[in-house]
């Protein structure tokens, strides 16, 4: 088989890899999965700090490794790490004390490491495998197909994960003699994702490296990547427009994303049946088709700061609405918060792409991702300490208390930053 023929299947393999890698059935029940294993909510939130810190530390070196060791090598590594992270969860002992917590920490570390390894390497390998003649149009087609497959996979995974987690639903379709326990049902979504991880490993092993991208050594490439990232970070945070967008954006994203990771715990708090969680996740996924269109219209009509203010306002309404946590009506503001993430992401990305020149655009977006993960991890740490400090422990009362106290903090910080942003943009216009 000639080289062009051998790499021609890479784009199709990329589509299947990115779908199976990202559409995970445990997403709609992620928080309660850890809680039902025996962790407290503050321990679970602390695990998110481990995940965010791992990505923060390894995102940049992984890009250099992909360029020196090869994109296929990084993707195979990401798949192996995915198998390991799922195995940690699948075999973690319920109420297992320090053994359970250690395996959960390992799961979050391996998950962050896997995502850092896969980040960008899959797209780069698929793009380089396309014919050079009409590569741009061909990539649009591949990317469009990948987005459709991911969206469909996400909806399917959300629904299946929520249904399988509830033993009462599973036992309705099984003969009485095959009835399963709640403990077994809770492992089913994890087992499905473990199978997906094994399929991802097979797919990546069958990929073909298009070209040897770099001749320089790995250490030199890592140093070069870190140097470029630091140089770009300096530009981002000294350039008024980009600095303002990133700082305001991360202040909103950190709080909203923290809630996104505990949604299943919140759904349980307001009394929603577990089997419905996946349908809410699927609804949010489908809303992702609508939110970008709304965001595009508002960003064309109003300035960046106005749209950031709109995102902050939506987030404040949502955060205020979820405080009671005692009624199914609290689901509406929770859904609003989830959709705010999409609007914020569109606004920040559009602004940074406009402000950055093509030579540094990819690194600017990478710096944005690093800054957002650092802020998210820091807020997760504070939120977990707030939960743990509650006199009654980290139960329902502690969660309601934490949800209450984050609202004035969010209002003060984002309000102050928006006023600072108005001053910064005023200086940009005056320059």
Named regions from a protein language model:
Residues 1-11, 207-247:
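Juxtamembrane intracellular "pre-TM" segments in multi-pass secondary transporters
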Residues 13-30, 47-64, 73, 103-168, ...:
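Substrate-agnostic recognition of the 12-TM MFS/MFS-like secondary transporter fold
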Residues 26, 33-43, 172-182, 266-276, ...:
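Short extramembrane helix-to-coil loop segments that connect adjacent transmembrane helices in Major
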Residues 68-79, 299-313:
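Cytoplasmic membrane-interface "Motif A"-like loop-to-helix N-cap segments
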Residues 80-98, 104, 313-326:
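C-terminal ends and interior cores of transmembrane alpha-helices
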Residues 165-195, 385-414:
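A membrane-interface helix-boundary motif in multi-pass transporters
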Residues 170, 182-186, 190-220, 419-431:
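Helix-loop junctions on the cytosolic side of multi-pass membrane transporters
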Residues 305-348:
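C-terminal transmembrane helical hairpin of 12-TM major facilitator-type secondary transporters
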């Amino acid at each position: 088989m000639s080289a062009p023929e051998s790499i021609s299947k890479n784009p199709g393999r990329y589509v299947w890899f990115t779908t199976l890698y990202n559409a995970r059935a445990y997403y709609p029940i992620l928080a309660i999965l850890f809680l039902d294993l025996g962790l407290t909510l503050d321990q679970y939130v602390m695990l998110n700090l481990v995940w965010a810190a791992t990505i923060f530390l390894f995102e940049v070196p992984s890009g250099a490794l992909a360029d020196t060791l090869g994109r296929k090598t990084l993707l195979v590594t990401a798949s192996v790490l995915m198998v390991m992270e799922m195995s940690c969860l699948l075999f973690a002992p319920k109420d297992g004390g320090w053994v359970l917590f250690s395996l959960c920490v390992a799961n979050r570390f391996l998950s962050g490491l896997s995502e850092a390894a896969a980040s960008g390497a899959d797209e780069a390998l698929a793009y380089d495998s396309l014919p050079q003649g009409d590569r741009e149009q061909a990539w649009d087609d591949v990317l469009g197909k990948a987005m459709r497959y991911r969206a469909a996979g996400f909806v399917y995974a959300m629904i299946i994960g929520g249904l399988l987690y509830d033993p009462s639903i599973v036992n309705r379709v099984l003969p009485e003699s095959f009835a399963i326990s709640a403990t077994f049902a809770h492992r089913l979504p994890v087992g499905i994702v473990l199978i997906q991880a094994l399929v991802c490993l097979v797919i990546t092993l069958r990929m073909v490296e298009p070209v040897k991208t770099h001749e320089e050594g790995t250490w030199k490439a890592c140093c070069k990547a870190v140097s470029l990232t630091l140089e770009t970070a300096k530009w981002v945070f000294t350039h008024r427009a980009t600095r303002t967008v990133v700082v305001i954006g991360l202040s909103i994203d950190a709080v909203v994303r923290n809630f996104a990771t505990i949604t299943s715990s919140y759904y349980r708090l307001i009394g929603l049946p577990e089997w419905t969680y996946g349908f809410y996740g699927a609804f949010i996924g489908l809303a992702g088709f609508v939110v970008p269109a709304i965001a595009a219209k508002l960003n064309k009509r109003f300035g960046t700061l106005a749209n950031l203010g709109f995102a902050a306002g939506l987030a404040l309404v949502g955060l205020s609405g979820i405080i009671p946590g005692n009624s199914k009506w609290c689901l509406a503001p929770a859904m609003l918060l989830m959709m705010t993430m999409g609007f914020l992401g569109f606004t920040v990305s559009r602004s940074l792409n406009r402000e950055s020149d093509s030579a540094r655009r990819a690194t600017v977006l990478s710096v944005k991702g690093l800054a957002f993960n650092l802020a998210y991890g820091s807020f997760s740490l504070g939120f977990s300490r707030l939960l743990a400090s509650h006199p009654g422990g980290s139960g329902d009362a502690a969660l309601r208390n934490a949800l209450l106290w984050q609202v004035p903090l969010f209002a003060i910080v984002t309000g102050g930053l928006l006023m600072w942003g108005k001053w910064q943009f005023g200086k940009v216009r005056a320059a």
